[in-house]
């Protein structure tokens, strides 16, 4: 894939899927900008990516900061929003403020980023959002996450129609992936979680971040794809 001369902005690019995407995009010759909340992780990520990479802290829930950041650039070709969070618990027990926080992070955050980026995006560019396998195959104790993932997919399809002729809009729906997002879960609980998920999948394991990042590269490069929800879930959607 050739991305020489293209400016790719990756939100959540300091770790996991976002970092692996940044590595692949840089190898393809793109000018890379990674954004995330923690400056220390950004600094380390920039070393891993190598070459010329812009790494700047940004909280996508801060509307003024997001607007100010995008106002500083002349042009963006591709926007990838991998930053996300999760929430699990019984429907009747999960505090509503946590549900609201999840909605603000996983839906309103990307929504805000796309609105701010659009005036700077070159015609023919693309946007890649992230949902999750729970959007169409919900599990118990994940009502909020399942619903919000579905909302991201609906947003993807709506924007693909509304922004047709300007930019393409697609979405990755990944299955469980071995990323730092789960580092807060203590061992052996984390390993058990991966093992339990693996047993339900035809491929017999959870994903590695690079495998999801390769799907992002497909969406960036295939000019005939828009409004697509790309399942990279190890077969969860058919299991």
Model-identified regions with their sequence ranges:
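Conserved NAD(P)H cofactor-binding loop of Rossmann-fold oxidoreductase domains
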Residues: 82-89, 234-235
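Substrate-binding pocket helix/loop in short-chain dehydrogenase/reductase
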Residues: 90-91, 98-103, 193, 197
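Rossmann-fold cofactor-recognition segment
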Residues: 48-64
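Catalytic Tyr-x(3-8)-Lys segment
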Residues: 190-211
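Conserved Rossmann-fold SDR core element
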Residues: 153, 163-177, 225-232
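C-terminal substrate-recognition "lid" of short-chain dehydrogenase/reductases
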Residues: 205-232
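Conserved glycine-rich cofactor-binding loop
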Residues: 14-16
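Catalytic loop of short-chain dehydrogenase/reductase
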Residues: 102-103, 107, 111-112, 126-164, ...
């Amino acid at each position: 894939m050739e991305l020489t001369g293209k400016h790719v902005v990756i939100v959540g690019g300091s770790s996991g899927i976002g970092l692996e995407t940044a590595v692949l995009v840089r190898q393809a010759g793109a000018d890379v900008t990674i954004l995330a909340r923690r400056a220390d992780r950004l600094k380390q990520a920039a070393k891993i990516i190598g070459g010329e990479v812009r790494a700047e802290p940004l909280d996508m829930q801060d509307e003024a900061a997001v607007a100010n950041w995008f106002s500083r650039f002349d042009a963006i070709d591709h926007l990838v929003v991998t930053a996300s969070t999760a929430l699990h618990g019984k429907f009747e027990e999960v505090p509503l403020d946590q549900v609201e926080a999840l909605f603000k992070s996983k839906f309103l955050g990307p929504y805000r980023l796309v609105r701010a980026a659009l005036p700077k995006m070159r015609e023919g560019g693309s946007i890649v959002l992230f949902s999750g396998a729970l959007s169409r195959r919900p599990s118990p104790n994940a009502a909020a996450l399942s619903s919000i993932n579905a909302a991201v997919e609906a947003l993807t399809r709506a924007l693909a129609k509304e922004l047709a002729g300007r930019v393409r809009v697609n979405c990755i729906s990944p299955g469980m992936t071995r990323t730092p997002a789960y580092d807060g879960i203590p061992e052996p609980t984390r390993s058990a979680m991966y093992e339990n998920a693996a047993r339900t999948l035809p491929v017999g394991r959870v994903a590695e971040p690079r495998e999801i990042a390769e799907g992002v590269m497909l969406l960036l490069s295939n000019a005939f794809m828009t409004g697509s929800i790309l399942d990279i879930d190890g077969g969860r959607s058919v299991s």
